[in-house]
């Protein structure tokens, strides 16, 4: 069984760090982002957009699960709000990225999200590039935040 570690986040909150759980989820997020990039290269832009959303969702869930918190749902913006409610500093621009990605969760996959045609007919290389960029920003923030919390632990957090 994994042993979580306690850390103080600049005196505001106490978190339990579960590195193994964080890594399990974060590796999955990174693999999803790699898959999105491959889809974009092949011209499967709707799937690149969807997987960009998935990568961002999985990365924020990695952070929350790594902190011993519950992480439910698929809205990246809501998951970031949960992180913020728990004392983490979430930049507003990151929430904007999350909102853009949240718009891609359903219509990238389901024909009935559109009046006619199929999802793949509606997405472009530019859409995919923007989604991948937004997802990368969220993954970078998650990784930086995790490293900061681990640094607190190394510096003597409880």
Question: What residue ranges belong to the model's regions?
Answer:
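Terminal alpha-helical segments
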Residues: 1-158
């Amino acid at each position: 069984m994994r042993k979580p570690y306690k850390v103080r986040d600049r005196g505001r909150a106490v978190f339990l760090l579960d590195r193994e759980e964080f890594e399990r989820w974060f590796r999955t997020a990174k693999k999803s982002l790699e898959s999105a990039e491959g889809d974009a290269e092949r011209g499967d832009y709707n799937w690149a957009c969807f997987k960009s959303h998935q990568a961002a969702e999985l990365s924020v869930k990695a952070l929350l699960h790594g902190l011993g918190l519950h992480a439910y749902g698929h809205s990246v913006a809501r998951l970031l709000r949960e992180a913020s409610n728990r004392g983490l500093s979430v930049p507003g621009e990151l929430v904007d990225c999350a909102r853009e990605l949240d718009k891609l969760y359903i219509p990238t996959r389901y024909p009935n999200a559109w009046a006619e045609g199929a999802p793949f007919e509606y997405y472009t290389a530019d859409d995919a590039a923007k989604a991948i960029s937004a997802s990368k920003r969220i993954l970078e923030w998650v990784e930086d935040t995790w490293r900061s919390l681990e640094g607190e632990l190394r510096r003597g957090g409880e």
